[in-house]
């Protein structure tokens, strides 16, 4: 097998060019501005210029991809944190809702008991005192006022006829 003298000469020239090219580290290559890079590339072959520019572009893209991965991980962590907070809030609201439903059921039971009592009182007084189902019970508590006027007594005087005051209503 014989070696072609022309190809050997071309290989020797190529090696010399590679040896004469300034060696730039990856960090230095990425850190150069375009103007500085072009200054470093003067006098190099088009092939060497293309290779260095491609290497620089590859390194920069690698950096951009890494920063995107970091950003995506940070966003994912933030979204997980928000999700956990929202889940805790939903649980809290569900507990509050359940407690309010229990309270509402208890109040409905009391209302129905009061209506039953009002009906029994009205039935004992006669048909004229029957309670209309659409009436509303209003309970007002007030502190006795120390001013002039009649002092609050033990309640209305018992006499003939229906008792004054609001009538009970249907609970819904």
Curated annotation (Swiss-Prot):
Physiological role: Since they lack a putative transactivation domain, the small Mafs behave as transcriptional repressors when they dimerize among themselves. However, they seem to serve as transcriptional activators by dimerizing with other (usually larger) basic-zipper proteins, such as NFE2L1/NRF1, and recruiting them to specific DNA-binding sites. Interacts with the upstream promoter region of the oxytocin receptor gene. May be a transcriptional enhancer in the up-regulation of the oxytocin receptor gene at parturition.
This protein's name: Transcription factor MafF
Keywords, in A-Z order: DNA-binding, Nucleus, Repressor, Stress response, Transcription, Transcription regulation
GO cellular component: mitochondrion; nucleoplasm; nucleus; RNA polymerase II transcription regulator complex
Biased composition (Pro residues): 145-172
Location(s) in or outside the cell: Nucleus
Pfam short name (any one): bZIP_Maf
Lineage: Eukaryota, Metazoa, Chordata, Craniata, Vertebrata
PANTHER family, per the entry: TRANSCRIPTION FACTOR MAF (PTHR10129), TRANSCRIPTION FACTOR MAFF (PTHR10129:SF25)
SUPFAM superfamilies according to UniProt: A DNA-binding domain in eukaryotic transcription factors, Leucine zipper domain
UniProt xrefs under SMART domains: BRLZ
Region listing for Basic motif, in residue ranges: 51-76
Primary location recorded for the protein, binned into one broad class: nucleus
Domain of life of the native organism: Eukaryota
InterPro entries assigned to the protein according to its UniProt record, in alphabetical order: bZIP (IPR004827), bZIP_Maf (IPR004826), bZIP_sf (IPR046347), TF_DNA-bd_sf (IPR008917), Transcription_factor_Maf_fam (IPR024874)
UniProt family annotation: Belongs to the bZIP family. Maf subfamily.
GO molecular function: DNA-binding transcription activator activity, RNA polymerase II-specific; DNA-binding transcription factor activity, RNA polymerase II-specific; RNA polymerase II cis-regulatory region sequence-specific DNA binding
Assembly and oligomerization: Monomer and homo- or heterodimer. Interacts with MIP. Forms high affinity heterodimers with members of the CNC-bZIP family such as NFE2L1/NRF1.
GO biological process, one term: in utero embryonic development
Region (Leucine-zipper): 79-93
